[in-house]
Structures are given as structure tokens and as C-alpha cells.
């Protein structure tokens, strides 16, 4: 979400199981075309090591999204404004090899044609145009591709990635506990209303509770408990159920480290 040289828009899509991964790969490519920016398809070790039997019908090819926004072809060779202003942040483009058009590319700030510029007014305009892509994506991407509220509860668990399967199964053993699974991590979805008045818990495969930090930053809602595991082993059902029961019963610390498999 934050890595890279300078600040630029990118989308981060985290798959929760193998079927998600198959479909999300297609979505990531479609979004990269649509928004003309980087899309990170985030997987993890446990998904990569998992085997699963799925019906053939599940592996469907998704219909193409919005047609690529192409620049008009020129009658004779000529430059065109590859980085022209656009209300939604996405400028029309010509694929490489398009007859009659050409443009310049540079890693420095550039004008509408692609020439390097240090003009501060133009710099602001180009930066604001690029970053507008995030808001456009947040508004256009269907909510079901951003997050899924599998069940609501006074204790609301948030997770991403391969914790999905374990936490969905854990719900069968827990009363009053809900699960909100996040798929689009950036731009962060507008989930603050779903968190209102809940005891919030994140369950994650990392040391610090990265999702908890992100949720607090983007929603201004405090995450009350962080359940983390970082020993290279997946979170198991019994671990998840035991720790979430402790949260529900009010006897859990703010940070819970899972160590099964050591």
C-alpha cells in the first residue's frame, strides 16, 4: 500500500481462497487496464501451499469490464496528449503500435504530452489527476469485490487473505461473533458504518497487526483486540475459536499471539 518511489495510486486486492484467487487475477488485470495504474494481487504462503477440489463450473471466465478508453487514431503520424486532464483521473491512451500516434514516457513529472516539466502548477494538476483514480475505483468497483460481511455480531472480526476459511468455520462455534472479510485493501473500502458500536478484533498472519493499523487509520475506529500469528504456521480452528471466545467473555488482552505449531 505504501511501498514504492514517491506517492502514486495503486489498487491492492487480497484473495481469501483458491476460487477467489482465480477470479481475482482476472479482475486485477481488468482494473489495471481500466484505471491505468498498478494493481497488486496479494496472495500468501498458505494459499500457495493449499490444494482444493472445485467444480469445473467455478472456473469461469469473467466478462470484460468497461472498454479500454482509447485515444482516437490520427490520420498522419502525430503526438497526442497521453496525460490529458480527465475528471475521473484516467486519460485516453493509444496502445503501443497504434498507427499514426506516438507519445513520450518518463519517470519524471511530465506535461500532457509526456515531456518533463518542473512547473509547480502543472505538477499539482497531474498529481491530483493521478490520485483521483483511487476515488473513481472506490466508487466503481462493486461492494462485493471490496468486502463481504458474512455475519454481524456485537464482536466483529476483521480479516483478509487465507484466514477466511478458518474464521468462517469458527463462526459455527461462536455466538454473537460476526466476520467482515476484506478483499480490496486499497483504496480502503468505506466500512466505518459497519463497525459502529462493535468490539473490533483483527485476526492476521503478521507480527504487528497491520490490518488493525489500517482499519484505525482509515475509519477512525479503535480495534480493541489484535490476534496475530507469525511463526510461519497457519491459524488453526481451535486457536481461533479459543481466542475469540476469550474476547467475547471479556477476558482477553489487547494483543493475543497464537503459537500453535512451534
Sequence positions of predicted segments:
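Short beta-alpha connecting loops at secondary-structure transitions
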Residues: 6-14, 224-231
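Active-site/ligand-binding-proximal alpha/beta "capping" segment
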Residues: 7-29
